[in-house]
Structures are given as C-alpha cells and as structure tokens.
C-alpha cells in the first residue's frame, strides 16, 4: 500500500546538535526524503540554516515543521547549551511563515524512533533479551551527552525528556578518578557530559597524557579516534577504552534508574562510528558490573543504533500526533513530572 502525500504539502524535519544541523522532508506518512547535513558553524542562526536547506531543494510553502534540538525546551525561548544559537520559537515560526513549528528535545525524538527501527538499523552488543513493552533507555555521545527514556502507556509510546548528561561524573576505577582529579583543576563541576562526549574524548586524552613524561601532544577527537581504531597509538587506544568504560557506567546507571527492561539504545555521533571496536571495548562488561544489580543489568540488551538519520521518524511521529490531536502541549512528548502531554502512537 502506497502512502498518500500530505494534502497540505511536505513537512520539514530537523535534528539540531551542537555541531551538525540535519534536515529532511516527509512528504507522506513514513516517507522521508532529501536528508541533508549542514554544519551549524556555517550559519549565524537556525532560521538561516533552515532557509539554506529549503532553498537547496527549491521547497517553498512548508506549513508544518518540527525541530529536535540538543537542549532542554521549557518555553518559547531556546538557548543552545553547546552552540551559540538562541531563538524564540514563535518568532522563528513567524519569520519562516510556518503554520506549525514544534521544538522538542533531540533525544526525546530519538527515543520515539526506537520502536520503528528495523532489525538492520541497530546492532546488539552483548547478551540480554528485551521485555516487550518494557521501559527503554536511550543515550548517545556527540558534541554533548543525550539521555532519554521511553514508556509504553495506554497503548502508546511516551518519551521522557532528560538532561541526564549533566549529572555529576562518577569514576569507577583509579584511572577514571585520576582523570576526574585532573578535570577538577579546571572545572568546579565535572558532569558526565564533560567526559562522555566528543570534546570529552580530547579531555580524557589530555588527562591521561598529563601522567606521562614527556607529555604527548594534544590531539583532536577525530585524530584520537582514528589512531585508536588503527591501533597505531597506545595512548589513543587507552583513551577510547576509558571513554567506552565511562559510557558503560552512564548506561548502567540509566538502566537501574528507569528499570529499562526494554533495552538500552545508543545513538549520537561517536559510538556508531567506532563499529567493531566498540563491540570489544569495556562498555558491556562495565554495564554489567553493577554490584548487587549485576544480574539485573546482564538481562538487559544494549544496542547501537546504526540508522543514518535515526531521529527523523521519531520527530515525524511527534509532529503527526500533534497535528492529528491539536493538543495544547506544544512539545508533544511526556516530560518527567509533567502530566499534561501526549505521545505518538507507534508500532510495537
């Protein structure tokens, strides 16, 4: 059966991180085309980035749009944590001449997409079996560290927004404690995101290098990852090993916090690029190393999302639910501690 095009034209989908702005068009339910990634640094504002994308495809007359952004969304004003863009949702909607502009947390959108992933769009790391309709945890490292949850309630999936990447970093061994102590010389508060992220990889490398004499030269995150994967630099390998272990701790904490019997899914820009290197890293052993809850976590599957633009289907579902229900909640996802919200009905 062919999906019928939307009578009011294609819908704009955007996934905005601290480094990249990803755009696509949904011309019919589930039919997403023209995905394109733009560099946030190339544009002074979100509006200019949107206009550049639409001009590329000569696509005017967009009426409905959704932006999934790496930031908490608590009202009309949005100021990004890991980029300089800040904007009013209503002013942006008016400037772009949209009828609808929803802005939601990026990992809430990614969480909503998880039930729609095909088997070839994720790779399980380690053992465990998901419980049908069990709570799902989603996390991922990129410019920052995104975290969200997903619950099945009243025949629909509801995303739980979170800023869990900003919890205090918790070291699990002496090496990680040494890294934390190095960071304390520079920061009063060291969050999980400070280390378990793209910029965090460079900081871990710097902290480990400081323990060597002479100190190895500082490297970019891209260089560290490349050297580690080619196994050409022992310090870079140790850095990525440390990073993967830290991510395992974050995932383990999320698992016991939400009782994620439906599984943990890992997105973001870093881990999917590590491929098989991540599969043999300390991530899974750290995930299961949870003291009295080790057997609990061992039953929970952990998977890496490999789809190239995984947040788009979730964002599209949130927008569709909003337009279908005309809900008064402008974000169309469930927030922790906030009851007046809706979620999109997705396949199970």
Go through the PLM ranges and name each one:
Residues 100-131, 222-234, 238-244, 249:
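ATP-dependent carbohydrate kinase catalytic cores
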Residues 107, 143, 269-270:
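Active-site metal-binding loops of divalent metal-dependent hydrolases
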Residues 11-15, 62-66, 102, 128, ...:
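Short glycine-aspartate micro-motif
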Residues 27-28, 80-83, 117-119, 152-155, ...:
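Short, glycine/charged-enriched secondary-structure capping and boundary segments
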Residues 1-56, 60, 178-348:
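ATP-binding/phosphotransfer module of carbohydrate and carboxylate kinases, centering on a glycine-rich
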Residues 21, 72-74, 144-148, 203, ...:
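Short, acidic Gly/Pro/Ser/Thr-rich loop/turn segments
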Residues 124-192, 275-276, 282-288, 292-297:
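Glycine-rich phosphate-binding loop of actin/hexokinase-like ATP-binding domains
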Residues 57-103, 108-121, 138, 273-276:
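Short beta-strand-loop/turn "lid" adjacent to the catalytic site in phosphate-handling enzymes
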């Amino acid at each position: 059966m062919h999906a019928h095009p939307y009578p009011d034209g294609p819908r704009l989908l955007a996934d905005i991180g601290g480094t990249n702005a990803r755009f696509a068009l949904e011309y019919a339910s589930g039919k997403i085309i023209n995905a394109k990634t733009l560099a946030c640094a190339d544009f002074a504002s979100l509006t200019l980035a949107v206009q550049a994308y639409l001009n590329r495809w000569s696509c005017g007359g967009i009426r409905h749009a959704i932006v999934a952004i790496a930031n908490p969304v608590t009202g009309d004003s949005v100021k990004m944590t890991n980029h300089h863009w800040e904007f009013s949702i209503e002013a942006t909607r008016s400037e772009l001449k949209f009828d609808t502009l929803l802005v939601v947390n990026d990992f809430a959108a990614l969480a909503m997409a998880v039930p729609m992933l095909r088997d070839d769009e994720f790779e399980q790391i380690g053992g465990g079996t998901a419980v049908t309709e069990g709570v799902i945890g989603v996390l991922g490292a990129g410019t920052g560290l995104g975290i969200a949850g997903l619950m099945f309630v009243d025949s629909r999936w509801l995303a739980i927004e979170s800023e869990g990447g900003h919890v205090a970093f918790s070291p699990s061994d002496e090496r990680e404690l040494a890294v934390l102590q190095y960071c304390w010389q520079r920061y009063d508060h060291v969050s999980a995101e400070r280390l378990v992220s793209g910029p965090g990889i460079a900081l871990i490398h710097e902290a480990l290098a400081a323990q060597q004499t002479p100190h190895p030269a500082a490297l970019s995150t891209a260089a560290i990852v490349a050297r580690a994967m080619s196994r050409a630099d022992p310090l870079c390998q140790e850095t990525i090993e440390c990073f993967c272990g830290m991510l395992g701790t974050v995932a383990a904490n999320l698992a016991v916090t939400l009782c994620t019997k439906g599984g943990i899914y890992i997105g973001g820009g870093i881990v999917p690029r590590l491929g098989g290197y991540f599969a043999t890293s300390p991530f899974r052993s750290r995930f299961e190393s949870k003291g009295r809850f080790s057997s609990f976590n061992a039953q929970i599957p952990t998977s890496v999302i490999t789809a190239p633009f995984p947040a788009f289907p979730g964002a599209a579902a949130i927008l569709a639910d909003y337009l279908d229900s005309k809900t008064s909640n402008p974000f169309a996802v469930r927030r922790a501690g906030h009851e007046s919200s809706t979620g999109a009905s997705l396949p199970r």
